[in-house]
Amino acid sequence: LLVASGWRQLEIDGDNAYARERIAGEQTIFDAATALPLAEVTEHVLAALGFVGVAEGAGLQLLGVPMPAALKDLAESGLNFEQLRERRAVPLRSVFPDLAGDVVLVDPGVESEVLEAGRWLEADAEARLVADALDGGAAAAVLPYGVYRLTRTAVDTPDASETWPLGTEIHLAPGDAFAVTAPVAGVVAVATDRGVLLDLRNGWTLSIDGVQAECAEGDEVDPGTRIASLPARDATRPVAVTLCRADALEGATPPILALDVPDEGRAQLVAPERVAAWSRFTFDPSALLSIESRTQRDESGDEQARREQIFASAQERYYDRPMQIERGWRHHLVDTTGRAYIDMVNNVTGLGHGHAGVADAVNRQIRILNTNSRFLYRELAEYSERLLALLPENSDLDTVLLVNSGSEAVDLALRLAQAATGRKTVVSLREAYHGWTMASDAVTTSAYDNPYALENRPDWVHVADVPNQYRGTYRGDATGAKYAADLGADLDALATQGRDVAAFICESVLGNAGGVLLPEGYLADAYARVRAAGGLCIADEVQVGFGRMGSSFWGFEQSGAAPDLITIAKPMGNGFPIGGVITSKRIADALSSQGQFFSSAGGNPLSCRVGLAVLDAMESEGLQENARVVGARLADGFRALAARHDLIGPIHGEGLYLGVELVRDRESMEPATAEAAAICERLRELGVVVLTTSERSNVLKVKPPLCLTSESADYVVAALDRVLTEGW
């Protein structure tokens, strides 16, 4: 209706700009809706409106759940569920009465324990799962109906893979010929050398695909009637059993029955976005086959509601309607429907998700010893020495204090600086984020995380100007001296007020701004001025350090600066909670004036062993170099897009900490905040997880695991290009 009226309006008034602008979007909606059969679209609409389908209602009846009268009528017009209940017996014997031996249900799902370490990406992953079951002596291996198959998940693709099977797939071990019997009564509708289709005379059909028919079309059969045979076989043979509404078969896209397609004997699959309809068109045949039902639905909405019941409103989350992530591998995340996403935001898992070395380290150490750091064990010193060895050659830092997070690390660093100087005042930069503890939050000034950040700083915190080359008081790289001079003026003013500075804290790269590099010379000059004023310099490397810059291990090395204290965390444990402060013994020993320091879990054997595994992997896998190479490729790709799309402003950062700033006008620098949010949503639809940052929420933050490949980087650039070209 919208399309027709739109075109009619343009016929009447061809200069109607509003109608011409709207017609393109309305035509897109129309084309998408008409690309599927009407029956399927109808079921999607009914599902969205909350109407329970025949199959769903019948399923409730099968489970013994009372049903409303209207649903009961629908269910009674469908399958004879009492008949199904009576057929419960030895697995698969209702179809293969001569089958002898165990039947194994194979788990090809997203949370399958046998698909770890990226095994699911192998082309023959599914076949190997079946082979493993049969090699173990099983007579049949079953891939269940309705279980989203991780084995069918493809990565770096704009469309979700077809992962949800419409039938049960049975793989039979090599052996002699089998008789095939009807598990329910019906009329033979199709009989070929590829399978049999039974009309159950109630609006439903049952297909058994991958067998040779021994019946004729029109034959009436009872439960147990021989209808086909499975020939003798030297190799594994698949047979698919599908319960489907008759009205879904005609014109179905794709064909639902395996006998309609060349890949005989295998259940057909649909993409997650089509499950709402096809779960109403099909039904789980497990009861017919006397096997366990494992049907899955996308329950992310229920999981989100469950979380909201126990979460505080202040606790952050990604996306208003988030996907439910239950697996990760390297730089990919996979949701419960088998949809894969490139993870472009997870700087916590620097090595990548599911890293075997970290998992093995945890498994081994937790079985041997895990206690607190007041006991003597070798892992603590070994890990601390490895961290110190990563410092620049001229560094005089020689002491490590381990905690459990970046917030704790910043909190401890501030306490150390105040103890060592005997002063209280701390200078932090505007628009900075440093943590959530009392002290680390006090020096956090970002309105992005706290809209009231600048209104409620304690009196011991002084906020200095942020040296943002793009949006700051001074613009361009040759502004470091000006920003440093302004900081020096702040320090002088504080001294005049009797507020001598204890510490100056800043990120070595402006992470919260989207990876904005500090102006040349700023950090070294700022450190010199702080030290001249008697203060100490804290480099917050929690986000930007640990190899992410590519050209250097630490962010402060980019500026040729040497901090007095370094805070580290996020990637240290690849998701395992580890944080720390690296400093000098002179500064660390000052803490004794305030009592003893101890962290129950900080520096325990398990944390240290994980930390060592991370460092080993970073070295053996060349991840810092990968960050340099792939990061440069990404940045070049984004800059090439900027030449074609005016919405892209500057590309910030280095290595694999980048920011793509979106602006409505490059001269005025008006932030494209709404556009950035919409683009992130559209990128998610295309299989890329990227989110916004900065005070204006208009910068796409790019900080993926350091194992990001060139192929995935190219896909991200192409996806962003597509969104900017087609719209969002």
Put a short name on every predicted segment:
Residues 1-72:
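Charged- and aromatic-enriched interaction segments used to assemble
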Residues 28-30, 194-217, 248, 252-257, ...:
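Active-site region of chymotrypsin-like
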Residues 67-72, 248-252, 666-669, 710:
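Short, charged/polar, Gly/Pro-enriched secondary-structure boundary elements
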Residues 73-120, 216-219, 229-292:
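Acidic, glycine-rich catalytic/binding loops that coordinate metals and/or anionic ligands
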Residues 112-181:
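Short glycine/threonine/proline-enriched tight-turn/helix- or strand-capping micro-motif at secondary-structure
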Residues 164-168, 174, 181-214, 237-240:
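Zn2+-dependent peptidoglycan hydrolase active-site motif and core
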Residues 186, 218-230, 338:
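A structural signal for short beta-strand/turn segments enriched in small hydrophobics and glycine
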Residues 291-728:
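Conserved N-terminal phosphate-binding loop of PLP-dependent enzymes in the Aspartate aminotransferase
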